[in-house]
Amino acid sequence: MTSSRFGRLAPGVRDVLPAEAHLMRGLKEKFTKLVETWGYKEVVTPTFEYMENLASEELQEEKFFKFLDRQGHLMALRPDMTRPMARLVATRMKGITPPLRLFYLANVFNYEQPQVGRQREFYQAGVELMGPSSPEADAEVVAMVAEYLMQTGLADFQISIGNVGIFHGLVKQLGLPKEVAQELKEALGNKDFVKVEEILGSHAATPEEARRTLDLIELRGGPEILDRAFGLAQPGPAADAIDNLRQLYWGLTCYGVERHITLDLGLLRGLDYYTGLVFEGYTVAMGFPICGGGRYNQLLAKFGLPMPATGFAVNLERVLVALERLQGPPREPVPDVLVAWEDNSLANALQCVKELRYQGLKVVTAMFEYPPAKAKAEARSLGASRVIYFDKEGKSEELSL
């Protein structure tokens, strides 16, 4: 008996038809071309690995796609690419002198509630810059993702940048217990500043300290907020993180991308391996971040190679959806030329096809003998702009459309 699921797709995955596939391939090709001009080299990691390579405190186990191999080992599909990239460098490239500039194009898997822009399987394009720990390295990856988003046609995007050192410095300064710090982190991540104010009011030493802390983490805008931030922060880790942001912003102005940058001193991302810079990119056409990244100086050490690193990932599915909303549905690729033939002229027609394809043209060959009128109708149906017709004498002519 045939299952009721036969012929259907599981929730959270989808088929990609020619028009979208063509647009997606274009996004991948633009990404590859761009990052290679910045000196980045492509690597490929397995789609699944041992669960212990991918698991961490911040990645909830129920979000993984897991299975047992025939030896009983627990395996999982990769939920992101940062940990696989860290493992790869720490185990396979540890003898290479840094900096290492690497990029990837990969599908990743998260077991979550499907909706537009949030699938269980989706494609990422990303880079990792491993070795340098400077603000200049962070500026390189942020400027690179900004340049890529510009090349996709998303002119209205903004990248919010912050530094988790501000949060950790404030937690230390306030002496917050671990569970309270986690509660504060979740409230900040949800931009629930009412809850943030409630937590600070209950645990800060004085109302003034609570107000100064809240004022600091609510700061958002251009470089003008940094002077205000320095005035609110006490000397220590939080002030150091603000200074790091100042240096980073200066680097981004050197790249000429500052109009796409917003400073957000309360920005946190969901993954605990970030140690400094964090950032997320947004566009008006998409309610979720289209890209994100940051600095993770401790992750490679978990695989035996202490090395600072920074990087980003672009969610190509979300970029595709945003482009469709802004520009309309993508168009299917069409051939440049239809070559049609009659009687015994197929050999001549195929020689012509070969020469045209050698010139880089997209050429479709008629599958049957066509009279000229049928060839022209077929060309219009395909969207071809030219028709070359071979008669029974083997002579060719270009038919007008």
From Swiss-Prot:
Name of a matching Pfam family: tRNA-synt_His
Subunit comment: Heteromultimer composed of HisG and HisZ subunits.
InterPro entries (UniProt xref): aa-tRNA-synth_II, aa-tRNA-synth_II/BPL/LPL, HisRS-like_core, HisRS/HisZ, HisZ
Encoding gene, per UniProt annotation: hisZ
Sequence similarity: Belongs to the class-II aminoacyl-tRNA synthetase family. HisZ subfamily.
Remarks, miscellaneous: This function is generally fulfilled by the C-terminal part of HisG, which is missing in some bacteria such as this one.
Subcellular compartments: Cytoplasm
Function: Required for the first step of histidine biosynthesis. May allow the feedback regulation of ATP phosphoribosyltransferase activity by histidine.
Main location: cytoplasm
Pathways per UniProt: Amino-acid biosynthesis; L-histidine biosynthesis; L-histidine from 5-phospho-alpha-D-ribose 1-diphosphate: step 1/9
Molecular function, one GO term: histidine-tRNA ligase activity
Gene Ontology CC annotations of this record: cytoplasm
PANTHER family: HISTIDINE--TRNA LIGASE, MITOCHONDRIAL-RELATED, HISTIDYL-TRNA SYNTHETASE
Organism: Desulforamulus reducens (strain ATCC BAA-1160 / DSM 100696 / MI-1)
CDD domains (UniProt xref): HisRS-like_core
Keyword terms, alphabetized: Amino-acid biosynthesis, Cytoplasm, Histidine biosynthesis
One GO BP: histidyl-tRNA aminoacylation
Name used for this protein in its record: ATP phosphoribosyltransferase regulatory subunit
Keyword Cytoplasm: yes
